[in-house]
């Protein structure tokens, strides 16, 4: 039985599902413990689940078998977008330095922070501190980091503490680091969040085990060798359909309205609790109400990268939002070729339904420059307009000639998408104007 620690805005739904799937939920929050009748269990988890920065998904990190089992069950239930890192957090490997600030590691080339002086061509022991996901390069350091359930032993020479350890427990652990664990602390020691539940003997025992492992790893190996597997990491993104499925799971435990998780991602607190309590089915109206004035558009890549675009809603129709965005001068418009001059702006049309968003571009004087259509999951309206990019785009200038972009990228990362999202299509012939979507190029715009 795998042990899972679950945090964040999806905690109730995912705890319900995890229990149904045979996981043991450990270190539950008081609210979760009360809802599920769970007894306190300070056991360290095999997998931790927490919010993704976009609030449109979660990050799962832990022992690889536990992470893989969780991903398998999530795919079966919610059919989400899943991007698993190609190397583990704290994988320890022998890497060869190539170029400036790069090392060959598991999952491809990895960046090395500039504070380390590297000799090109030299081979050394490295540890992955930021796993590579999709096209995002990982980060590795020429240090050894050995993960345990309670502690992390490393070669940094520093003592550190998880931010989830309070001052009282931190004082106890600091005294321990200066006494019984002093020899390990002089090498480099970090107390993980589960350490606050552990006794002195348990911590000392794990420190000794990690020290022996660190000595073994310090012997190195041939270039390219993976000396120790770290923890698996995966980004799991929920589109609107998947969030509705999680609403259903939560509703089996506590009163939950349709759209609960989408609205919670908008930052709603007590007012959402009230909607849950009275059973008000008002998701569409609530989302439209929130999508007023200044909004942030969260363009979320399948691997979890978030591109944030801020703008002002200039038109709110029943079926489409029109958002005006001022662009930073410099460079050219991708797929269109027009230069971004001072005053150039975009009108972004976000349909309530449909798998696309339309960005049309205008000069400072309102002359139409071209359009970029993004294929994505059905957008979620609100003070945050959220969608997951499906990697295929279409661009056309004033001449109307269409260019399909990024098809190779879709082929490369289609495995991250559920089958239902693997054949996206960016519609052509659509242009965003101050009045909404049209198919005719405007002569000028005065938004």
UniProtKB/Swiss-Prot annotation:
EC number: 3.1.26.-
Keyword RNA-binding: yes
Pfam families in the cross-refs: DUF402 (PF04167)
GO molecular function: mRNA 3'-UTR AU-rich region binding; RNA endonuclease activity, producing 5'-phosphomonoesters
Keyword Transcription: no
Keyword vocabulary terms for this entry: Endonuclease, Hydrolase, Nuclease, RNA-binding, rRNA processing
Disordered: annotated segments: 424-447
Example GO BP: rRNA processing
Function: Probable RNase involved in rRNA stability through maturation and/or degradation of precursor rRNAs. Binds to RNA in loop regions with AU-rich sequences.
Family statement: Belongs to the FAU-1 family.
Protein name (Swiss-Prot/TrEMBL): Probable ribonuclease FAU-1
Gene coding for it: fau-1
